[in-house]
Design a protein with these regions (language model features):
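Internal alpha/beta domain cores that form substrate/cofactor-binding pockets in large enzymes
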Residues: 46-48, 129-134, 154
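A short SAM/SAH-binding and catalytic strip from SAM-dependent methyltransferases
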Residues: 90-101
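A SAM-dependent methyltransferase catalytic signature shared across enzymes that methylate proteins
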Residues: 145-162
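A short glycine-rich, Lys/Arg-flanked "PGG" loop and its adjoining helix->strand segment in the class I
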Residues: 104-116
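Conserved N-terminal segment of class I S-adenosyl-L-methionine
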Residues: 1-90, 104-107, 139, 160, ...
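Acceptor-substrate binding/catalytic loop of class I
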Residues: 129-147
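Conserved beta-strand signature within the Rossmann-like core of class I S-adenosyl-L-methionine
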Residues: 115-123
Length: 221
């Protein structure tokens, strides 16, 4: 049984930040880019119509078998043009697998696909990773920083523990008993959700509609 105090103190995850956007009531359609065979968006169905996009047919087929999404698109987001927009577009653990120039192109494309919100999660700075599970696409090719997202109008939060005690694939950086327990304590002490400079992962969120007018909403005469 989960410890209630631990649950209360638990820092928010990428899934929590996604739920926060859905809770606004403004998200009726959502696109998960690089969806693979599972998705954080599934929990919001049926109130949110979800679409999974992946370049790999095997991933799409397995996602269909599992009933992960309402709709599916097999496409390469960097080369195929999509004639659709969505209230929310998510990218979980995707952009770091691309070279930097391709990642910047991806952000440009994603910002055209979203009518309201974008949410992405990626490691903070470059974190080496090889072709895990025999999949060359699991290799990391770029690292991303807070100022790169903030410069594009994103709000950035931290997740997944601290960058000081987390390492390869977010596992313990050091081989001593209790490393991850110590990381949990340090995560709370450093308040990584609000201070992403300490975090292992970054969650970047953007409202593509920009900041609404606060004073003069009517056109000038």
């Amino acid at each position: 049984m989960p410890n209630p105090l631990r649950q209360l103190l638990r820092p928010r995850s990428a899934a929590d930040f996604t739920a926060q956007l859905v809770a606004t009531g403004e998200v009726k359609t959502a696109l998960d880019i690089g969806c693979g065979t599972r998705s954080h968006l599934s929990q919001f169905r049926p109130s949110v119509q979800t679409t999974g996009l992946d370049a790999h047919a095997d991933a799409i087929d397995l996602a269909k078998q599992r009933g992960v999404h309402d709709h599916y698109i097999q496409a390469d987001i960097l080369s195929d043009n999509l004639d659709a927009t969505f209230d929310l577009v998510t990218l979980f653990g995707l952009i770091e697998h691309l070279p930097k120039a391709s990642g910047l192109d991806l952000l440009d494309r994603v910002e055209r696909l979203s009518a309201k919100f974008i949410l992405l999660e990626t490691p903070h700075s470059f974190v080496p990773q090889g072709p895990e599970f025999g999949n060359e696409f699991q290799r990391h090719h770029s690292g991303w920083f807070i100022n790169e997202f903030e410069g594009r109008g994103y709000t950035v939060h931290g997740t997944t523990g601290t960058r000081y005690l987390r390492g390869y694939m977010a596992g313990p950086r050091y081989n001593f008993p209790g490393c991850l327990l110590l990381d949990e304590a340090l995560t709370l002490l450093l308040r990584i959700n609000r201070k992403p400079k300490h975090a292992f992962n970054l969650v970047a969120i953007k409202d593509v509609r920009g900041v609404p007018a606060r004073h003069k909403k009517e056109a000038q005469p």
